[in-house]
């Protein structure tokens, strides 16, 4: 039997934040997250451990993820911790004339010519996804998210969790929509990221299921 602790409903939260790496002058995406990690650790890795906050790679080489090192009960304390790490990353990237860019999707990135799949650890998994789905689309390579991972210990707790958040889920995109432009053009959607995400796994829709909203 696993010794891994099983958390109860709302006992803790896991937080993940994704950022693009871009040129400071042109805002063009830069697939140099591996160089960022190498500059910090001395080696190309898939994770950088920094106490309460860790950095990790994503599917594409221009996106870096900041995440809680372990589930936390103290969400407010991570506001300053994440901000501190963003400043550290920007200081390191400045040596390459690069910086982090927030928002949900890059407004003028061309994913069909600028996508670079992560070529290092776990590349065989990413390459398989790329072979199946062609990950050059906006729904794969131009997609930055914030994840709040909420635990549940059993089916009853999952039912309560779903009941508690089902009214909030459709509201979140309306409050946080920040991707009205793709390919340098207004799309007609305030949350173009969500619209792209809706279609990115259409070849195997069972992998995603229904999207809310």
Task: Pin down the residues of each PLM region.
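Short hydrophobic/aromatic beta-strand micro-patches
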Residues: 22, 149-151
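Short aromatic/hydrophobic contact patches that present stacked aromatics
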Residues: 65, 147-149
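Loop-rich catalytic cores of soluble enzymes, especially ATP-dependent carboxylate-amine ligases
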Residues: 107-112, 118-132, 140-142, 151-213
């Amino acid at each position: 039997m696993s010794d891994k602790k099983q958390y109860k409903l709302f006992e803790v939260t896991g937080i993940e934040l994704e950022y693009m790496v871009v040129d400071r002058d042109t805002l063009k995406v830069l697939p140099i997250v591996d160089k960022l990690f190498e500059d910090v650790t001395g080696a190309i890795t898939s994770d950088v451990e920094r106490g309460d906050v860790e950095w990790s790679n994503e599917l594409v080489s221009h996106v870096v993820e900041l995440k809680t090192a372990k589930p936390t009960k103290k969400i407010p304390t991570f506001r300053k911790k994440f901000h501190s790490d963003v400043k550290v990353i920007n200081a390191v990237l400045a040596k390459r004339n690069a910086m982090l860019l927030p928002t949900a999707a890059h407004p003028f990135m061309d994913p069909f010519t600028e996508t670079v799949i992560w070529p290092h650890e776990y590349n065989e998994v990413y390459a398989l996804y790329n072979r199946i789905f062609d990950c050059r689309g906006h729904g794969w390579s131009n997609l930055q998210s914030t994840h709040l991972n909420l635990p549940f210990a059993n089916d009853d707790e999952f039912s309560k969790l779903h009941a508690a958040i089902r009214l909030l889920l459709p509201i979140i995109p309306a409050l946080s929509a920040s991707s009205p432009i793709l390919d340098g053009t207004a799309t007609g959607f305030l949350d173009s990221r969500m619209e792209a995400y809706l279609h990115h796994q259409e070849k195997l829709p069972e992998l995603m299921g229904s999207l809310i909203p």
